[in-house]
């Protein structure tokens, strides 16, 4: 998919590789910018990934990340099915060892990894009717269904009913669908090691 994206836009000099984000095997200090988007939310030890990002940045280079904080996802008017889905989603992530609210923690992870000039901002989106992201929370819970059932967070019937009711509510064009927060953080690798 990434190769098709690059080729479709005529981007040259792009190498696509698959690697463990904790140990990429790439040379240290070889990038002006190291960026990750919605990666840390999916790993149990995000500090290891941040350490690798810092290792890859050249002295004076930048590390940036965009990570979600799922706590703020909502809809208006509120609906109990959507609210319950928004409870099941982070509970499933947490039980898998990931942090669904990692966005707010990224600046601190960057500081602990030795970055300076750390900054942070956050964005929220309103998903209009017809936008595929409008049902993202419901879609993700549907995709995690086997895990949810195995963990005992909800039963088959409850999941079916929640899915149908939440989708019907979001199908109403009068319903306002609000994303969780997306935190953007950045920091600079010091030009020389601190003493």
For each of these PLM feature ranges, what is it?
Residues 119-177, 192:
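C-terminal helical/coil "lid" or tail adjacent to the Rossmann-like core of SAM-dependent
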Residues 32-47:
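A short SAM/SAH-binding and catalytic strip from SAM-dependent methyltransferases
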Residues 22-34:
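A short acidic, Gly/Pro-enriched loop at the edge of an enzyme's catalytic core
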Residues 113-116, 137, 180-195:
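Core SAM-dependent methyltransferase catalytic element
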Residues 2-3:
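Conserved SAM-binding loop
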């Amino acid at each position: 998919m990434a190769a098709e994206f690059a080729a479709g836009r005529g981007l040259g000099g792009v190498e696509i590789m698959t690697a463990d984000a904790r140990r990429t095997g790439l040379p240290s200090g070889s990038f002006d910018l190291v960026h990750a988007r919605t990666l840390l939310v999916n790993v149990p030890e995000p500090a290891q990934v941040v350490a690798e990002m810092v290792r890859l940045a050249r002295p004076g280079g930048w590390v940036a990340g965009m990570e979600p904080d799922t706590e703020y996802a909502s809809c208006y008017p509120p609906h109990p099915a959507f609210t319950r889905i928004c409870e099941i989603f982070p509970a499933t992530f947490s039980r898998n060892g990931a942090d669904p609210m990692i966005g707010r923690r990224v600046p601190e992870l960057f500081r602990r990894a030795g970055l300076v000039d750390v900054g942070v901002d956050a964005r929220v989106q309103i998903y209009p009717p017809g936008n595929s992201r409008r049902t993202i929370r419901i879609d993700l819970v549907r995709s995690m269904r086997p895990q949810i059932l195995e963990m005992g967070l909800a039963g088959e019937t409850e999941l079916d009913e929640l899915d149908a009711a939440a989708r019907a509510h979001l199908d109403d064009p009068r319903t306002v669908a609000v994303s969780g927060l997306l935190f953007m953080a950045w920091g600079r690798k010091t030009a020389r090691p601190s003493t």
